[in-house]
């Protein structure tokens, strides 16, 4: 037990030593996320058209919560992710996955339309800049947790950047009072997330969307409460960093969370 506690503390400390998670609250920070997305989704993957301004943006950015990861060594932003929320005041607004998977969702598992709309969001546009994800086989992925990311029992390693961004997703969701998060992803991503303790449930058949993508749902409280010590230590560091950034910016979120 002592070894597990020591290891979890060193995992959180290790993350804090090399990386920082922060919410993109200013226009400059949001533009940093848009530049990362352009580098990954437009230039590297070719999933979106290259744009003259170097920003990858869409209509959902205005209603999204954006998160960045920064390298402490370089001081530069190296990854991002966003949570798309339903447009405030628009009861008819739908999240992107609801349209893409309209005909394949299994509403007997969960019906997004029946949930409190202000309490749900979609995880979207997770990206890590190329130089940080170019191990063999990763050149065409914006960021995915692989079994090999954790190394072997003899030579373990921890995928700090990816886990940090996912912990940022859940910390931001908690701070903003979100209860359910949806994800449209390759089925293997959902499997890898489950393997490392980020519980998610597939809620429909895979559909074609730049390859086969399947919708899944994650319960924010359930995931946070059931993180193993290694992930939880990173989550605590990330949540504290986000809280500090919100306070410094005098940004209003759920006061109980701060």
Segments (PLM) and residue ranges:
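Acidic, low-complexity proline/glycine-rich segments
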Residues: 1-6
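Accessory, usually C-terminal, subdomains that scaffold auxiliary metal cofactors
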Residues: 197-256
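Short hydrophobic beta-strand segments that form the core of ligand-binding sensory/regulatory domains
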Residues: 82
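Beta-rich nucleic-acid/ligand-interaction surfaces
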Residues: 53-60, 188-192
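Glycine-rich acetyl-CoA-binding "A-motif" of GNAT/NAT acetyltransferases
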Residues: 75-78
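Short amphipathic alpha-helix that is part of the acyltransferase structural core
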Residues: 7-55, 62, 66-70, 85
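Short glycine-biased active-site loop of nucleotidyltransferases that positions the nucleotide triphosphate
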Residues: 57-61, 205-208
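Acyl-donor binding region in acyl/amide transferases
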Residues: 88-218
